[in-house]
């Protein structure tokens, strides 16, 4: 425990909390342009071909962003909106693309959790 005299000379340091999503710069989402759209494999013990886009953001950052859902229409030069949220089994992927906004289409034939995938409500028969 520090004495009062020591604290007067040198106050306590505040702990700086490190952001999990630094490229967003305290914004909820950011717009960017796809520079590369590709698939990659997850860490052990999982196995799949995960869809990922390399995105150059409006603030100059370049990040990897996961494309959720079944099927997508993204290619190079597509304009996308990204949000925070990492993918646990893909190292270095700390952002998600927002489905159903800008050039990203929503998932087709999606019945449940539609708002997460930008899918419209299906028509009644």
Swiss-Prot record:
Sorted UniProt keywords: Methylation, Ribonucleoprotein, Ribosomal protein, RNA-binding, rRNA-binding, tRNA-binding
Location of region: Disordered: 100-125
UniProt keyword Aminoacyl-tRNA synthetase present: no
Modified residue annotations for 3-methylthioaspartic acid: 89
GO cellular component: small ribosomal subunit
Cystine pairings recorded for this chain: none
Family annotation (Pfam families): Ribosom_S12_S23 (PF00164)
UniProt-listed GO biological process terms: translation
InterPro entries: NA-bd_OB-fold (IPR012340), Ribosomal_uS12 (IPR006032), Ribosomal_uS12_bac (IPR005679)
Basic residues composition-biased segments: 111-125
Gene Ontology terms, MF aspect: rRNA binding; structural constituent of ribosome; tRNA binding
Role description: With S4 and S5 plays an important role in translational accuracy. Interacts with and stabilizes bases of the 16S rRNA that are involved in tRNA selection in the A site and with the mRNA backbone. Located at the interface of the 30S and 50S subunits, it traverses the body of the 30S subunit contacting proteins on the other side and probably holding the rRNA structure together. The combined cluster of proteins S8, S12 and S17 appears to hold together the shoulder and platform of the 30S subunit.
Family: Belongs to the universal ribosomal protein uS12 family.
The protein's assembly and partners: Part of the 30S ribosomal subunit. Contacts proteins S8 and S17. May interact with IF1 in the 30S initiation complex.
NCBIfam families: rpsL_bact
Name of this chain's protein: Small ribosomal subunit protein uS12
Protein species of origin: Thioalkalivibrio sulfidiphilus (strain HL-EbGR7)
Gene name tied to this protein: rpsL
């Amino acid at each position: 425990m520090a004495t009062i005299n020591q604290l007067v000379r040198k106050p306590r340091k505040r702990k700086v909390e490190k952001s999990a999503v630094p490229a967003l710069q305290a914004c909820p989402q950011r717009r960017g342009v796809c520079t590369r759209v590709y698939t990659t494999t997850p860490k052990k013990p999982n196995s799949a071909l995960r869809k990922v886009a390399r995105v150059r953001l409006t603030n100059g950052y370049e990040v990897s962003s996961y494309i959720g859902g079944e099927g997508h229409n993204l290619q190079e030069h597509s304009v996308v909106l990204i949000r925070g949220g990492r993918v646990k089994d893909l190292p270095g992927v700390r952002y998600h693309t927002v489905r159903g906004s800008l050039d990203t289409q929503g998932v087709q034939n999606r019945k449940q959790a539609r708002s997460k995938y930008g899918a419209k409500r299906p028509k009644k028969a």
